[in-house]
């Protein structure tokens, strides 16, 4: 922070802030500033009304700023474009959560056993094996997005970089809902033990008989997860169409331009649903 400035570091270097602000574009609330106090510290743009910039919001007078409701996902097209590497970051978020879910399945356990039997070195370096496999999945997701961004960018008369910057935010709904869906099971199950953790914070067995108490069926949890993923996919496709319409006045032309991206979104969504449908590992 001392070297680059507080806001620059938070926007580009502090991981948790970057993740939180990325997912905030999907939120139903937005910060807005009617009359900015000066140039944006985060270099998010110089629009007359600035949306989604905490630095500009804090710097503005109280009468010139506010918080308002908005439709879920509308921040994808209302807020400024993502910074350098923003597209790769969003795709990496999605890929790492999908991979984390895959590592808990029986198929991953079978794959791991198959590899370890044939390459003993990986068996002795299990963490390195998992890291390399995760990087491979992330690279595959990013390469697929880069290829599609190139196609879409050329169809719009621009470059692959332009396509990536414009359409990367449209993947945030898919990444966001899969993130929530992935950890929803932990919330439902482990959340039932919150009272026991509060009553026994040091693990002294003061609450030895803590057990699940909600009785929520696993099928209900699974269907909620599926519904979340499908909902996020629908919002992502809708927002991609709105982004396409910003440069294509003809509705049909906008559909043609975004078609490769929609196919990629279907592939990303299918990968999440496929992982969700796998049998969990007994380990």
Where on the chain are the PLM-derived regions?
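Transmembrane-helix bundle segments that line or gate the permeation/cavity pathway
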Residues: 1-66, 99, 229, 271
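Membrane-entry segments of alpha-helical transmembrane domains in multi-pass membrane proteins
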Residues: 1-12, 27, 76-88, 121-138, ...
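Alpha-helical transmembrane segments and their helix-start/interface "positive-inside/aromatic belt" motifs
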Residues: 13-16, 76-93, 162-176, 252-265
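Loop-to-transmembrane boundary segments
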Residues: 31, 43-93, 215-225
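Long, well-ordered mid-to-C-terminal structural blocks that present hydrophobic/aromatic surfaces
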Residues: 95, 99-190
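Membrane-interfacial helical/loop segments at transmembrane boundaries in membrane proteins
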Residues: 106-122, 193-214, 282-283
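Hydrophobic alpha-helical transmembrane segments and adjacent short intramembrane/lumenal linkers
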Residues: 169-244, 249, 256, 263
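Juxtamembrane boundary at the C-terminal end of a transmembrane helix
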Residues: 270-283
């Amino acid at each position: 922070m001392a070297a680059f400035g507080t806001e620059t570091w938070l926007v580009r270097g502090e991981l948790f802030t970057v993740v939180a602000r990325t997912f905030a574009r999907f939120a139903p609330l937005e910060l807005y500033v009617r009359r900015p106090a000066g140039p944006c510290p985060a270099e998010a743009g110089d629009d007359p009304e600035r949306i989604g910039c905490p630095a500009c919001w804090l710097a503005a007078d109280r009468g010139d700023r506010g918080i308002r409701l908005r439709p879920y996902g509308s921040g994808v097209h209302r807020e400024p474009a993502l910074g350098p590497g923003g597209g790769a970051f969003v795709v990496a978020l999605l890929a790492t959560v999908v991979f984390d879910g895959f590592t808990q399945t029986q198929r991953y356990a079978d794959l791991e056993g198959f590899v370890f039997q044939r390459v003993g070195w990986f068996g002795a370096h299990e963490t390195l094996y998992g890291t390399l496999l995760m990087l491979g999945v992330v690279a595959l997701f990013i390469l697929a997005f880069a290829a599609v961004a190139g196609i879409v960018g050329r169809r719009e008369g621009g470059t692959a970089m332009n396509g990536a910057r414009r359409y990367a935010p449209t993947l945030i709904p898919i990444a966001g809902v899969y993130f929530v869906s992935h950890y929803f099971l932990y919330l439902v199950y482990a959340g039932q033990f919150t009272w026991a953790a509060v009553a026994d914070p040091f693990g002294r067995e003061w609450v030895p008989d803590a057990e699940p108490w909600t009785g929520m069926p696993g099928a209900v949890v699974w269907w909620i997860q599926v519904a979340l993923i499908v909902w996020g996919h629908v919002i992502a496709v809708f927002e991609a169409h709105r982004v396409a319409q910003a440069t294509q006045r003809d509705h049909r032309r906008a559909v043609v331009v975004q078609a490769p991206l929609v196919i990629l979104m279907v592939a990303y969504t299918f990968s999440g649903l496929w992982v969700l449908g796998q049998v969990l590992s007994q380990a």
